[in-house]
Regions:
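Short glycine- and Lys/Arg-enriched binding-loop motifs that mark or flank ligand-binding interfaces
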Residues: 188
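Terminal (and in a subset, N-terminal) low-complexity or junction segments at the ends
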Residues: 1-182, 191, 200-591
Length: 591
């Protein structure tokens, strides 16, 4: 049949939904070959004139992942109606063809068909998935012009869109103007805060939600647990877990994985394991989360045990799984296991190692003092694989094992690759200082000043009475600053009495030695632990989250603090966990 004849015959001719042809489409589902065969049958039988059948065919072709086939079918539809457009826009947006959803929406407008709330929710979702802020604002104006500005579903979609696009102020304004906010709207706003790194705002809104009597669902909890992970709010994480249990909320794999991640990242890996063991049937993501949880705490043997069990259950590890495995091997010094895992990626699973895997391997060799092997590994990488992150891992190994000559060479290479990254200058300055080349330290510092580069600010958060408190180095913003500083001074004196000796090299090298010790004393994690000791009862474990790697001096000081206060102190820095107890650290000084 010619295309023109086909166009002429695809009209609004109705067909009963329970026809044999419709049932055939339902049975075929999103199977492209089957759909093409059914389309041929429709053409021969004349049933292609049914708008219901054509709409169903379009929806299923989207679900099958063939947007080109969808476009070809749509091209032959004469005078598509609103129902067809809405179904097509929703399916395109739902199955990842967001740009096509916007193009179909434009076609709908040029066809002089009025969009509905059903249209707008799908179009706004497409804008959110594309982070298309400008287009989304235009669609928002269409919403208002068409009188759907107060529709709760459209408003919830707008909240999600603005939040995903980073326009949190606008998202909150839309949210606050909603006459009725259902759980979907609350979830959208809470998720927006969490995904934009504002975990404290997410938690505050969650508490407001509870206060107003809105019952959270599993989606709410997944987001809140992620915020707890971000902030290290273990007590709130306990509360959420208890709420889930007490209210009989079904713990699916997604929620269980969120719990595993939260407990692991907040320092209670045994509780994470309990959640993992309670799963009837986990997926690769849940298994990977448990491997990662053990790895970040330095429990490499346990991480590998989970990895081997996963393979025994015939669950194929993916690239993310191998990042977790290799990281666990690096932090625990499991060199042979790491080598075997890396080799198996290509040989057994057909996976191509990426940047993260290469960084883990260099880090693993470097931590173990195998600098020549790490350097040889780098030399064997292709030009496109020699990214700054790989060299940064090598530089960290040079600093750890005091190979100043190679460290300076690599730091200078990093600066040539990323001249606007202040971290590289700081590392180069440290290498020069450790090598005793103070004139070079001053030179690097001057270059940073000339280029307007500033060292990344370090901060630490501590959860006290279910509230997060943030500190930065030398922070004096807290209302109890004087008491905190007095307590910390006394604490450091007690540590010195027990044998603690400050390590001035950990401070800024442009300072005099006495000034360096003063700067070290008021690092953010020391202020956080002083506040925590002041505000909690004797024997309570303190948990601190730091955005940067803990320095050598603070690592040493916390061992002594754990002795003189008889407390366990858990610190999560940007690399791993450190459990300080009775004068030792779980990392065994291997970080």
């Amino acid at each position: 049949m010619e295309a023109k004849q086909y166009e002429e015959q695809v009209d609004a001719t109705p067909l009963p939904r329970k026809s044999a042809e419709y049932e055939a489409l339902v049975r075929a589902g999103p199977n492209l070959r089957a759909l093409q065969q059914i389309q041929a049958h429709l053409l021969v039988s004349g049933c292609h004139r049914s708008r219901a059948l054509i709409t169903k065919l379009l929806v299923l072709s989207c679900a099958a992942g063939s947007i080109n086939y969808t476009r070809r079918i749509f091209h032959h539809v004469l005078h598509p109606d609103s129902f067809l457009f809405n179904s097509l826009i929703k399916s395109s947006s739902k199955f990842g063809f967001s740009l096509d959803a916007l193009l179909f929406y434009r076609h709908m407008l040029t066809s002089k068909l009025a969009p509905s709330s059903y249209t707008f929710t799908s179009v706004i979702k497409a804008c959110a998935d594309l982070s298309a802020l400008k287009i989304g604002r235009v669609v928002h104006s269409h919403v208002l012009v068409n009188g759907y500005g107060s529709n709760s579903f459209v408003q919830a979609a707008m909240v999600t869109f603005y939040a995903k696009s980073g326009a949190l102020d606008v998202a909150r304004k839309v949210f606050d103007e909603m006459p009725e906010r259902n759980v979907v709207a609350w979830n959208s706003m809470i998720s927006g805060y969490e995904q934009n790194g504002l975990g404290d705002e997410a938690v505050a809104l969650f508490r407001k939600m509870l206060k107003l009597g809105v019952r959270p669902d599993s989606t709410t909890f997944v987001t809140v647990l992620s915020a707890c992970s971000q902030l290290g709010l273990l007590d709130l994480g306990y509360w959420v877990h208890d709420y889930i249990i007490n209210h009989g909320i079904h713990v699916n794999v997604i929620l269980a994985t969120a719990l595993i991640n939260m407990f692991s990242r907040c320092g209670n890996v045994s509780r994470a394991r309990a959640v993992f063991d309670s799963l009837d049937e986990g997926n690769v993501i849940a298994w990977t989360a448990m491997i990662n949880g053990y790895g970040m705490h330095g429990y490499g043997v346990q991480a590998m045990e989970i990895f081997h069990r996963m393979k025994a259950y015939r669950l194929a590890p993916n690239n993310v799984t191998f990042v977790a495995v290799l990281s666990a091997c690096a932090h625990a010094g499991l060199i042979n296991e790491g080598r075997q895992a890396f080799a198996s990626m290509r040989q057994k699973y057909g996976l191509v190692p990426g940047v993260e895997h290469h960084v883990c391997m260099v880090d693993m060799f470097g931590r173990a003092g195998l600098l020549s092997e790490a350097y040889q590994f780098i030399k064997e990488l292709g030009p496109q694989e020699l990214v700054p992150a790989v060299w940064t891992a090598m530089l960290g190994a040079c600093k750890m094992h005091k190979n100043f000559e190679l460290g300076v060479e690599i730091a200078e290479r990093l600066i040539s690759l990323e001249p606007e990254n202040p971290g590289h200058y700081v590392l180069l300055s440290n290498m020069y200082a450790l090598a005793g080349k103070m004139d070079r330290v001053e030179s690097v510092r001057n270059v940073m000043i000339q280029r307007g580069l500033r060292k990344r600010v370090g901060y630490s958060t501590i959860d006290v009475n279910n509230n997060p408190y943030l500190f930065s180095m030398g922070d004096k913003s807290h209302p109890e600053t004087n008491e905190i500083y007095r307590y910390l001074d006394e604490l450091i004196w007690r540590c010195k009495e027990a044998g603690y000796v400050p390590i001035p090299e950990s401070a800024m090298h442009e300072l005099e030695e006495e000034e360096r010790e003063f700067a070290l004393r008021y690092h953010s994690e020391k202020l956080a632990v002083a506040f925590g000791l002041m505000k909690t009862t004797h024997g309570m474990t303190l948990r601190i989250v730091k955005n940067l790697k803990i320095c050598e001096d603070c690592h040493s000081a916390f061992k002594f603090i754990s002795i003189v206060t008889n407390r366990e102190i858990i610190i999560r820095d940007k690399l791993r966990f450190h459990h300080f107890k009775e004068g030792s650290c779980s990392c065994l000084d291997y970080w």
